[in-house]
Design a protein with these regions (language model features):
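N-terminal secretory signal peptides and thylakoid transit peptides that target proteins
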Residues: 1-20
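Polybasic, low-complexity binding patches
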Residues: 115-118, 122-135, 145-176
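N-terminal pre-ligand scaffold of iron-sulfur
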Residues: 28-125, 167-186
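Short cysteine clusters
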Residues: 103, 137-139
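Secreted/processed peptides and extracellular or luminal domains of membrane proteins
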Residues: 18, 109, 114, 143-145
Length: 186
């Protein structure tokens, strides 16, 4: 056995170990819903006047940085998102949810469907009657809940990546963090 074969085998085994560790980390995070967030380059501020009613959505763009463990580390990344008011009442961060509009299946831009009558027949056939707005990927009909971006239907391997609403003032909703995996896979 030559040194070249041993080095090649060690490199291969090292790559296999890294792949298994990455898959295990992701499975662990999904199983225990322990989502880790990273700060955005600067918080996104959405006027509260644009989110007065439940199920009212507002699009935004956020700037982040890829993680040190990403294929291209510490690079600027622009993320399109949508913030939604979930219910009436006092203006606390829990009343608002924000998601990344990039489908985790193949990276297509997800659409906010505010009118349940516009939901494709394939989706209603799979999940039943729709009474609330949804996020739908136009590429393969992956469908996600408005409440938290969790997956309802389709080939997407998981729900939408989430942003963290960090504060709500008298005039604005502030989005200051994004789910760590969004910075690895975008």
């Amino acid at each position: 056995m030559g040194t070249r074969f041993v080095n090649t085998r060690r490199m291969f085994l090292g790559q296999v170990v890294m792949l298994v560790a990455a898959v295990a980390r992701r499975a662990w995070a999904q199983a225990y819903d322990s989502v880790r967030y990273q700060p955005l380059v600067r918080p996104v501020v959405v006027p509260l006047d644009d989110l007065t009613m439940p199920a009212k959505a507002f699009p935004f763009t956020a700037d982040g940085m890829t993680l040190a463990s990403a294929a291209e580390p510490n690079q600027p990344v622009r993320l399109n998102g949508m913030v939604v008011r979930l219910s009436k009442g006092d203006n606390t961060p829990e009343r608002f949810k924000a998601v990344c509009l990039k489908c985790p299946h193949e990276g297509c831009d997800v659409e906010f469907i505010g009118d349940p009558g516009r939901v494709p027949a394939e989706v209603t056939g799979a999940i039943g009657k729709v009474s609330k707005p949804l996020y739908i990927c136009p590429c393969h009909n992956s469908t996600f809940k408005i409440d938290d971006g969790s997956k309802l239907f389709g080939p997407a391997p998981r729900g939408l990546w989430r942003f963290h609403v960090t504060a709500v003032s008298e005039t604005a909703v502030e989005i200051g963090e994004v789910e760590e995996d969004a910075l690895l896979f975008t």
